[in-house]
């Protein structure tokens, strides 16, 4: 691409229109994130949930606006090759001083891909690789603030860190909170080290808001040691603020950013700076996952696909049919050397599935819009994804031709998949249980029931609750990942099975009672879930009430009253109110 910049005024005008479209998108994105602080202060929890749900649509709305503008003002379909080449160069020039160049490049790609034929997707017209560096972009306010405990003491420094967030709601007892923070840190590190000359605490400027909690994210640096932390701040029952816990293990902070959780609301002028800081405390987190959890899902998808293509260049294994029981709706395949599964909607569903392709897509979108409470796997959705034909095992190609012929094409040396979902690979729960000892079975079944309970209180009914539709994560958490029958709890009708008019009817092949499309009889769960003796024993020990319609009806009643359950992305025993409860109890008795 050797055309010089500045020769094509049409390209210059289009580039300006494109950046205006992106800037509008990011302005709305930041306004939504800024309002999260106000909602947190006012305890408007539903507003937080609504903001996350609505934000999912922002990007596509702005892309569609930009596409319409390019068609109406510039007759985009008739642009020649020279103009497309100049357009990218002009756009790069605009981005040289931009605060979000990587996001703006992705926006450019999204707009162009709606206009260009896909044969152009990997050429010089698009950003196949980043063109503008995201290193050292200046920001005001800065990405993070630095505090120096040598100057004013550790206790005063911790107080100032918290007070600098300027929440317009008082703390119930900030001195007590600081005591708890310092005690938890002391117990974690064992002994206070001497302060080195570089001793400092770096804290990301914006708090991270999700549901009812605000998180202060940072790290302490002392000599060659770094100590990451995430401080959770919540409202107490009286409506005042209090520090709920401080997470100090990097893996626990990583769980906070799990894709099975709702996205954060964070006000960022320079998102790449936030991602860079977060990776310094969670080096095993991919940048694509961090962008996604910050609400920048399209950027997460862009970076994920670049990582996948890079992995394919440096590996030689083949895509194969995923192990486990085949699904009735999805064809699932995987690349053994890459920790993800790829899901394609079949052309024809199993006989028991009364739905169409549009319904399935709507259910997967629903999962992105709700609070996943750590129990629903997030998905990346792609259209016209090109993967190398040579990497597809012949059995997988045969399966694609037989079950999803309308969903892919072979063009040259590429397989073009027209619509694709990608999820983190997990161990299917049914396979986990087959190889588990008694203790592992009890743990997994308890986790399974807890997942169902937490989803229910978050207004999510899984629908198909077979063990094969749940997976076990690398942290041992049970997560649901089959969404074609998922529904809102409030849409369901949970019923008890009525008595049989005659005893012999209980032995009949067909039920003696009628059932509507949204009717659920929890008593029936035992029939298809509890066939294995070890599983049955553990389930009845921990979750017998899930077989009673009353449990489900009570949860529905709570949801309809507007009650929002508390979901903690960390063990409740790590909450300050529980960590030293025995000592408080003894002190109270002594008094």
Swiss-Prot record:
Q: What biological processes does GO assign it?
A: glucose metabolic process; glyoxylate cycle; tricarboxylic acid cycle
Q: Give the UniProt keywords, A-Z.
A: ATP-binding, Cytoplasm, Glyoxylate bypass, Hydrolase, Kinase, Nucleotide-binding, Protein phosphatase, Serine/threonine-protein kinase, Transferase, Tricarboxylic acid cycle
Q: Which domain of life is it from?
A: Bacteria
A GO molecular function annotation here is: [isocitrate dehydrogenase (NADP+)] kinase activity
Q: What task does this protein carry out?
A: Bifunctional enzyme which can phosphorylate or dephosphorylate isocitrate dehydrogenase (IDH) on a specific serine residue. This is a regulatory mechanism which enables bacteria to bypass the Krebs cycle via the glyoxylate shunt in response to the source of carbon. When bacteria are grown on glucose, IDH is fully active and unphosphorylated, but when grown on acetate or ethanol, the activity of IDH declines drastically concomitant with its phosphorylation.
> What family classification does the UniProt entry report for this protein?
Belongs to the AceK family.
Checking PANTHER family in the record gives: ISOCITRATE DEHYDROGENASE KINASE_PHOSPHATASE, PTHR39559
Protein's name according to its UniProt entry: Isocitrate dehydrogenase kinase/phosphatase
Q: Which organism is it from?
A: Aromatoleum aromaticum (strain DSM 19018 / LMG 30748 / EbN1)
Classification from the root reads:
Bacteria, Pseudomonadati, Pseudomonadota, Betaproteobacteria, Rhodocyclales
Task: Identify the coding gene.
Answer: aceK
């Amino acid at each position: 691409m050797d055309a010089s910049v500045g020769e094509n005024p049409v390209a210059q005008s289009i580039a300006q229109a494109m950046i205006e479209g992106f800037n509008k998108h990011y302005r709305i994105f930041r306004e939504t994130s800024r309002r999260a602080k106000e909602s947190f202060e006012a305890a408007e929890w539903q507003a937080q949930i609504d903001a996350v749900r609505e934000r999912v649509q922002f990007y596509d709305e702005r892309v569609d606006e930009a596409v319409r503008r390019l068609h109406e003002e510039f007759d985009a379909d008739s642009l020649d090759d020279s103009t497309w080449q100049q357009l990218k160069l002009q756009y790069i020039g605009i981005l040289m001083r931009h605060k979000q160049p990587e996001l703006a490049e992705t926006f450019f790609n999204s707009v162009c891909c709606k206009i260009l034929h896909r044969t152009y997707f990997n050429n010089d017209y698009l950003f196949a690789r980043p063109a503008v560096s995201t290193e050292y972009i200046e920001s005001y306010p800065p990405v993070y603030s630095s505090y120096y405990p040598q100057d004013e003491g550790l206790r005063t420094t911790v107080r100032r860190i918290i007070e600098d967030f300027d929440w317009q709601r008082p703390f119930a007892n900030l001195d007590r909170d600081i005591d708890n923070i310092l005690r938890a840190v002391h117990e974690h590190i064992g002994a206070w080290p001497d302060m080195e000359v570089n001793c400092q605490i770096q804290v990301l400027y914006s708090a991270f808001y999700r549901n009812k909690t605000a998180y202060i994210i940072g790290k302490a640096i002392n000599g060659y040691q770094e100590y990451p932390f995430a401080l959770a701040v919540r409202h107490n029952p009286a409506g005042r603020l209090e520090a709920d816990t401080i997470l100090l293990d990097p893996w626990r902070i990583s769980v906070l950013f799990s894709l099975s959780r709702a996205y954060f609301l964070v006000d960022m002028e320079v998102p790449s700076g936030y991602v860079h800081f977060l990776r310094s405390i969670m080096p095993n987190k991919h940048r694509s996952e961090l962008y996604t959890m910050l609400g920048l899902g399209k950027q997460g998808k862009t970076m994920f696909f670049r990582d996948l293509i890079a992995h394919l260049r440096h590996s030689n294994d083949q895509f194969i049919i995923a192990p486990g029981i085949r699904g009735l709706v999805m064809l699932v395949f995987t690349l053994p050397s890459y920790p993800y599964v790829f899901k394609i909607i079949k052309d024809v569903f199993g006989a028991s599935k009364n739905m169409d392709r549009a319904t399935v897509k709507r259910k997967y979108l629903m999962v992105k819009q709700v609070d996943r409470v750590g129990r629903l796997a997030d998905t990346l959705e792609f259209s016209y994804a090109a993967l190398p034909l040579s990497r597809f095992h012949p059995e997988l190609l045969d399966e694609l031709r037989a079950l999803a012929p309308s969903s892919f094409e072979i063009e040259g040396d590429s397989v073009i998949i027209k619509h694709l979902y990608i999820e983190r690979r997990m161990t299917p729960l049914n396979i986990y249980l087959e190889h588990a000892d008694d203790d592992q079975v009890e743990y997994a079944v308890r986790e399974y029931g807890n997942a169902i309970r937490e989803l229910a209180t978050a207004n999510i009914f899984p629908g198909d609750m077979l063990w094969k539709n749940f997976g076990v994560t690398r942290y041992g958490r049970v997560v649901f990942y089959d969404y074609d029958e998922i529904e809102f709890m409030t849409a369901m009708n949970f019923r008890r099975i009525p008595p049989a008019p005659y005893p012999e009817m209980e032995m009949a092949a067909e039920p003696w009672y009628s059932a509507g499309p949204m009717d659920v009889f929890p008593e029936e769960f035992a029939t298809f879930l509890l066939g294995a003796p070890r599983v049955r024993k553990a389930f009845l020990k921990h979750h017998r009430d899930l077989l009673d319609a009353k449990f489900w009806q009570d949860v529905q009643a709570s949801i309809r009253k507007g009650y929002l359950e508390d979901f903690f992305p960390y063990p409740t025993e790590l909450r300050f109110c529980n960590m030293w409860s025995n000592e408080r109890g003894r002190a109270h008795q002594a008094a």
